[in-house]
């Protein structure tokens, strides 16, 4: 709740964590309702309140009913369409202009320039470069753009740091991974963090111009390699919530999946990161974080057999793997990434146990 410093009878309040409806301009034709918080105003010191959330609180003007507030305006940020003002308790009156307010949200900042008008109040998205999004994965395609995987908002195609990025369409909610094929960067996949409503994942063969649905593709990380016959093999690892390091592959563009063999796992293991040698598509790396979370039933502290990083290498395009233990796993969950320094030259992290240089396709 906040007060207008120039008139303490004018108060604004908002909810935090309410799951209710907010309207966009196509509500009457496309049911464009977003679900989030409500905001209210009072002009009599809080004795009476008006719900000024778009789509709420009809007012009587002449012979017709009108909503007090207009539908939310995207303000040129197309990706925010259909998304709500939510997960935020901040509401601020501009001290230089009490007609203007700012509200924080889980996806950025919303503003209004005429909050005290009798009707026609207009809320609009106004992040100005500070969208609050969670990047779960990101790739930079050689000779192309950068592509992100974003929690809640799928992801974006980033072509210019000074321009608003384009969001993937169709949109599928929280995306955990984005990957491209190093032998043909036009081939890409993005996979859902959960089994989302739109699809568990999409693939493209034309650099993102069109996306096609995959089946049962949700998971943690992703990779692609090109087979000898020119077709593509997709990989996905289990999501961290599954507590397994398992890796799966698909030879039919993500419609069916088989389990890769040779990947060690126990209940409690973390999701596995994969990497393809660009000039040797048969060489697939899988960096495994093995963790048996039941160790405490039989010992005072875990040892190497319970918790370790293992680098697994495949020479048959990712069907079967052979693993080499690298170091003790110390529960630094971000240590499983693979950094590529050039052909047969990798760097892998092991938390408090340092970094390791890997050469000779994992032999050294």
Residue positions per predicted region:
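Extracellular glycan-interacting surfaces
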Residues: 1-364
């Amino acid at each position: 709740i906040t007060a207008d410093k120039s008139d303490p009878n004018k108060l604004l309040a908002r909810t935090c964590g309410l799951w209710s409806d907010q309207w966009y301009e196509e509500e009457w034709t496309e049911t464009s309702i977003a679900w989030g918080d409500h905001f209210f105003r009072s002009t009599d010191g809080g004795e009476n309140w008006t719900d000024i959330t778009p789509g709420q609180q009809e007012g009587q003007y002449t012979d017709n009913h009108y909503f007090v507030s207009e539908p939310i305006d995207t303000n040129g940020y197309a990706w925010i369409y259909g998304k709500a003002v939510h997960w935020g308790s901040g509401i601020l009156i501009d001290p230089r202009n009490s007609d203007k307010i700012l509200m924080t949200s889980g996806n950025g900042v919303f503003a209004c320039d005429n909050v005290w008008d009798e009707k026609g109040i207009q809320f609009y998205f106004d992040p100005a470069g500070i969208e609050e999004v969670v990047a779960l994965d990101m790739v930079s395609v050689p000779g192309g753009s950068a592509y992100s995987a974003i929690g809640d908002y799928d992801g974006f195609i980033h072509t210019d740091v000074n321009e608003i990025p384009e969001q993937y369409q169709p949109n599928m909610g929280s995306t955990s991974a984005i990957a491209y094929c190093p032998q043909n960067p036009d081939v890409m996949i993005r996979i859902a963090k959960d089994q989302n409503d739109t699809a568990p994942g999409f693939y493209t063969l034309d650099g993102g111009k069109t996306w096609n649905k995959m089946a049962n593709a949700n998971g943690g990380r992703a990779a692609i390699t090109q087979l000898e016959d020119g077709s593509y093999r997709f990989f996905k690892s289990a999501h961290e919530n599954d507590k397994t390091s398992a890796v799966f592959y698909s030879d039919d563009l993500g419609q069916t999946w088989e389990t890769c063999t040779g990947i060690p796992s126990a209940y409690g293991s973390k999701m596995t990161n994969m990497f393809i040698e660009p000039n040797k598509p048969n060489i697939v790396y899988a960096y495994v974080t093995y963790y048996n979370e039941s160790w405490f039933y039989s010992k005072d502290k875990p040892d190497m057999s319970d918790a370790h990083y293992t680098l697994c290498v495949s020479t048959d395009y990712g069907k079967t793997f052979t693993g080499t233990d690298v170091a003790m796993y110390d529960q630094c969950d971000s240590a499983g990434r693979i950094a590529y320094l050039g052909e047969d030259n990798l760097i892998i992290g092991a938390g408090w146990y340092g970094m390791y240089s890997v050469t000779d396709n994992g032999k050294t």
